[in-house]
């Protein structure tokens, strides 16, 4: 299965959720780190948290390829920011979706 194109230049949709240590701190760092995400071709369509559990984040993004997010998160500079943001990476669930 080719997840890299879906027939042309169409972006891949990523839907995910994860826990953070503190929503306000994580969101501030997420917003401040938008430049590197945009530089990697990653577009954020939605980011929010649960009303009942404010430290549970839900996110919808578009990426150039199915593995773009993983590559971005593994970059040492980005990994450092992600760790400092309080993102509990072991709780992350991401799904590659169609339109």
List where the protein language model places each region.
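Short S/T/G/P-rich N-terminal loop/turn motif that feeds into the first structured element of a domain
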Residues: 2-99
């Amino acid at each position: 299965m080719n997840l890299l194109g879906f027939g042309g230049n169409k972006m891949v949709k990523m839907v995910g959720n994860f826990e953070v240590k503190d929503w306000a701190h994580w969101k501030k760092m997420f917003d401040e780190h938008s430049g590197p995400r945009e530089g990697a071709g990653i577009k954020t369509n939605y980011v929010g948290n649960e009303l009942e559990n404010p430290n549970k984040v839900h996110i919808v993004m578009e990426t150039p390829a199915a593995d773009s997010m993983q590559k971005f998160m593994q970059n040492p500079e980005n990994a450092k920011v992600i760790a400092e943001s309080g993102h509990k990476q072991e709780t992350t669930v991401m799904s590659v979706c169609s339109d």
